[in-house]
Structure formats: C-alpha cells, structure tokens
C-alpha cells in the first residue's frame, strides 16, 4: 500500500464494498493481495474510530435491531478448540438501524450470548439522546440487555416470527417459511404500527450482497476474524456516508444530520495517514486517538 496512489486506493475500496472478494479485487485492480488486505485493515481502523466519534447524540424515534450470522474459517460444529481460540467458528454481526433515517447507529461483531447483547445495547444507548422505541427479534438475551442499557426509559417490543412445519425428510439450508409474527410488548408503550424489523432485515440483505464474506454457499467466508470485522467496519462507513439511499435520495448520515454532503470513496480514503510518511505509525496512533480510538483494532472494531 506504500506505493498506492489515491486513485488505486479508491479502486480497491470500491471493489470491496460492492461485493468483490479479496482475490477478485486483486484481479480487477492489479494491486497485490497483501496490499489489498493491508488497506482494508488500516482504513477499517480509522472508519470504525470515525463512526464511534461522529455517530453520537442522535435523535432517534424508532430503532430496529437484528443480528446476521456468518462464520470464520469453518462452522462452529466443525471447529477444533485450537481453531476456536483464534476466532474460528460462528460469528454474529449485530446492527441497530434508525427506521426513519436508515442510519446504522451501532454495530458489533461477536457472539450471540448475553454478554455481547449487553455490550451492543449499551453502545446503542450511549449514542441516543431521547426516549426511543426499539424492536428486536425474540432472542432472549435482548430482554436483559435492553433493560440493563435503557432502564425503564424506553418503549420496547419483541417481534417473534412463526415458522411453518418442516418435513423431516427434506434437507434445507434456509429456515422454514414464515407464516406469521407474534408481537410481545416488553416495556413502555410501543406503537404497534411501528413494531417491525423489516428495515434492519433489508439492511442485512444489503450486507449479504455487498460484503463478499457474507455470501452464502461459497468459499468466500473470512479466514481471519480481524479481516471479517474490518470488512464490516468498512461497509458501514460506506453505507452511512457514501451510499445514497434509494428512497431517501441522500445518504443516511445526511438524513440524520451528521453529514452535509455525500461522501466520496476518495474522501473516505483521506482518513488514512499520509502514505510514505516516516512517522506513519505515530500519525495513525494520533489520528485514532483524536477520533476516540487507539492504535488497536480490538478497541475500534470489537469482535
């Protein structure tokens, strides 16, 4: 990446956020594989730190939360204890979406247990300044996590999908057909008309189509948890600040008031410290500190 021009950086990032794998990006741009990965990791660091600093003090009326599954290295049932220790196995990306502005308020790459749910909801609560209506799926961990983060100052409902019977002799990859939904009011007085996870589930689909690592039934899955988390951080920066939403006609960041123009991918790349600088590592550490992170991927891209 030391010799990449700004134009080459833009080409690489554009390929990555539009559904191309690392190797496909190499073929499209002519940039070496290790250079592509290094650019992904370095840019993801500062993008995650920028999101953490800027996406705060939001006025949100309706928040939809969901999680999307993928795996690193292999599915959990096929992972040895040795590989599990380095991050292989099932991994969940939790997402909180503002139903009005379509802004991704918070995201977290990690497990699906209560500890991760609490961390996710606490992060959501720290970014919102008003009483909010939240809808999640029926995952039990959210019951305690939401109460722990928001207390009683919330209107919260769960939407539990009801699936049809599955033929025992039928092999399926996807869940059975959804035949209905059951709404459960957990706290406060949520408006039944707005108890929904449709927008955040549609955002999950955008992730599946735009991040190659999330594509089902391929060998494009992540081999390292660090690269997986970096791809998510890069995508959400692009989604919030660069990608014009079809129904809004502006970016989610503009609609929510935290940006005043559509970012270009080149503008994203300018977040990186200047290439070729003898003090690049120090520059990066100072930049991350200014943005609210530090020189550690674990701190700015939790996984």
Regions found by a protein language model. Name each.
Residues 1-303:
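Residue-level recognition of single "structural anchor" positions
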């Amino acid at each position: 990446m030391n010799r990449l021009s700004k134009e080459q950086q833009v080409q690489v990032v554009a390929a990555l956020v539009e559904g191309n794998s690392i190797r496909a990006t190499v073929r499209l741009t002519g940039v070496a594989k290790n250079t592509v990965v290094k650019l992904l990791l370095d840019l993801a660091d500062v993008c995650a730190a920028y999101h953490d600093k800027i996406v705060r003090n939001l006025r949100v009326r309706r928040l939809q939360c969901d999680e999307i599954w993928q795996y690193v290295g292999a599915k959990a049932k096929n992972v040895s204890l040795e590989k599990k220790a380095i991050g292989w196995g099932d991994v969940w990306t939790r997402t909180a979406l503002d139903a009005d502005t379509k802004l991704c308020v918070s995201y977290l790459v990690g497990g699906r247990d209560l500890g991760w749910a609490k961390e996710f909801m606490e992060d959501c609560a720290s970014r919102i300044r008003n009483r909010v209506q939240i809808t999640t799926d029926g995952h039990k961990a959210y019951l305690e996590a939401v109460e722990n983060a928001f207390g009683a100052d919330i209107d919260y409902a769960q939407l539990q999908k009801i699936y049809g019977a599955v033929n025992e002799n039928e092999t399926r990859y996807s869940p059975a057909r959804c035949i209905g939904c059951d709404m459960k009011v957990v706290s406060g007085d949520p408006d039944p008309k707005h108890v929904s996870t449709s927008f955040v589930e549609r955002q999950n689909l955008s992730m599946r189509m735009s991040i190659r690592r999330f594509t089902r039934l391929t060998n494009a899955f992540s081999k390292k948890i660090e690269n997986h988390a970096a791809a998510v951080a890069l995508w959400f920066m692009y989604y919030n600040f660069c990608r014009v939403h079809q129904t809004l006609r502006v970016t989610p960041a503009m609609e929510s008031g935290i940006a005043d123009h559509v970012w270009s991918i080149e503008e994203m790349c300018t977040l990186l410290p200047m290439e070729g600088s003898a003090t690049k590592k120090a520059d990066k550490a100072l930049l991350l500190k200014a943005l609210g992170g530090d020189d550690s991927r674990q701190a700015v891209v939790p996984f």
